[in-house]
A protein has these predicted regions:
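Conserved N-terminal phosphate-binding loop of PLP-dependent enzymes in the Aspartate aminotransferase
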Residues: 26-482
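Serine residues within intrinsically disordered or low-complexity segments
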Residues: 8-10
């Protein structure tokens, strides 16, 4: 009885907090969002419709089949948190283009910045000359870096390029050649980044891979590698890294860097315990290794912080950014301490399109919009509401094994039953939700985690609408398993 009373008081408190927040913070859609996008989801024809099908047929003939193509429709236009296909169907997007459009699809500030820059200078030749927006953007990134301690930026074209740059820089700085990464990690699909991926799906048929990369267990507490429970485990996974892998497991004294996602993305949207990142910092300091934070997916407001490192006060030596950095235009970067970045001499690293005119204009406008519209704070509020609702669904449905996350970076883990916690591969359930008008993408080492990662400008009403559809899809999927 006392437990039920406490639960009801907690629910009442959460409701009152949300009501108060709605008075202080406008949780409706921005005014610029198109009228058609406000109606999402709105399905007018079975997908793929005739126009989409024509384009899909041509695509299958001429475009590489390497892409997953999860959704069988052709995108036509977008606005806010909605996408319209070529046949007029409007979908509610819970993916933000894989955490790219944090300030919303077709944000007018970004669109206008692209148009203005295209009329002035498309390609900035940043490798051989100077460009004002590149300097402006680097200055902004220095000012918003963790602890304002990372003062120098190198721009590339993607998060994966950022990883490659971080690997090169850490080796150049330390004069060492090995790296520690984590089980469940994802850092890209080229070169060293691919070697650091932990899913066979991405690596199959592409070896051999560069040597000197060692995998440590990430604190995936739901499926602890050591069958322990947090916090009584005392972070055994970190002890294993320090005392097992580093001292006895293989690496010599030649480890240049520890490359880690402060909140693991592709591995299943896994927030580690709060002491994990500070322990990584301490370990790196004691052993002369650089700490590299891969914030490609979790950065720029996604978790309720500008950078997820900020949540634990951890200052990395190098931070990798991408995805949302460009506002929809290809862009990646490493932001590093001057003491680290400044060891590179002219010509040590380069990129033909790094610092490109269009990407600098778009990225600068997008990051400014994230900051000016206080989207990290908005993500924190909407994410708390979404996570509360999803955890209630977890208590209600046997196939929801976990709901976890920070801000609007939430993972919902689907299982065959809570009794066994055996992962349930979810493309079928993903299709059920899509046919109801909700776009979600998946993650997880077992392909059983839904990412709840909409644009941060999404409204409270749309969050609830999407979760309602998710519940309907869960109910249907659970019935199919009986």
């Amino acid at each position: 009885m006392i437990w039920r009373l406490a639960l009801s008081e907690s629910a009442l408190c959460a409701a009152l907090c949300l009501a108060l927040t709605r008075v202080i913070m406008d949780l409706s859609l921005p005014e610029w969002v198109a009228d058609w996008a406000r109606e999402a989801p709105k399905l007018v024809a079975p997908a793929p419709g005739p126009i989409s099908k024509q384009i899909i047929d041509k695509d299958r003939k001429y475009v590489s089949h390497a892409y997953d193509r999860l959704f069988q429709f052709t995108m036509k236009k977008s606005s806010g948190a909605s996408i319209m296909d070529a046949d007029g169907n409007v979908y509610l997007d819970f993916s933000a283009g894989i955490s790219v459009l944090n300030a919303g699809w077709s944000n007018p500030k970004v669109v206008e910045a692209i148009k203005e820059q295209a009329e002035l200078l498309v390609h900035s030749l940043a490798n051989d000359a100077y460009f004002d927006k590149e300097a402006d953007f680097a200055e902004l990134l220095a000012k918003i870096s963790p602890g304002q301690a990372l003062g120098s930026t190198f721009f590339g074209n993607s998060g994966a390029e950022g990883v490659e740059a971080a690997v090169k820089l850490s080796r150049y700085y330390t004069k060492k050649g090995e790296h520690i990464v984590f089980m469940g990690s994802y850092h890209g699909r080229v070169g060293n980044a691919l070697a650091m991926a932990s899913r066979v799906k991405y690596k199959y048929g592409h070896g051999p891979f560069p040597p000197g990369i060692f995998f440590a267990p990430y604190p995936y507490c739901l499926r602890c590698w050591f069958k322990q429970e947090y916090p009584s485990c005392n972070m055994l996974c970190v002890d294993y890294l320090e005392k097992g892998i580093l001292e006895f497991g293989g690496p010599s004294n030649d480890v240049a860097s520890v490359i880690v996602e402060p909140l693991q993305g592709e591995g299943g949207y896994i927030p580690p315990p709060k002491e994990f990142m500070p322990r990584m910092r301490k370990m790196c300091d004691e052993r002369g290794m650089l700490l590299v934070a891969d914030e490609v997916q979790c950065g720029l407001g996604r978790t309720g912080e500008v950078w997820e490192c900020n949540s634990t006060g951890t200052i990395p030596d190098i931070l990798i950014a991408g995805k949302a950095l460009g506002g929809g235009i290809p862009l990646g970067a490493i932001v590093a301490k001057h003491s680290v970045m400044d060891v590179w001499r002219p010509g040590s690293h380069s990129s033909t399109f790094g610092g490109n005119g269009i990407s600098m204009a778009a990225g600068l406008a997008h990051v400014r919009e994230i900051l000016e519209q206080k989207l990290p704070e908005r993500s924190r509020v909407l994410g708390a509401h979404a996570l509360k609702r999803l955890q209630e669904l977890k208590d209600k449905y046997d196939i929801i094994g976990d709901a976890r996350g920070k801000g609007l970076m939430i993972g919902v883990e689907i299982v065959k039953s809570k009794k066994t916690m055996e992962p349930l591969y979810v493309p079928q359930m993903q299709g059920i939700a899509w046919r109801k008008g909700l776009m979600m993408i998946t993650a997880g080492m077992f392909g059983n985690v839904f990412r709840i990662a909409p644009p941060l400008i999404i409204s409270l009403e749309q969050i609830d609408k999407g979760i309602d559809i998710f519940e309907e899809s869960t109910k249907e999927m659970q019935a199919l398993l009986k």
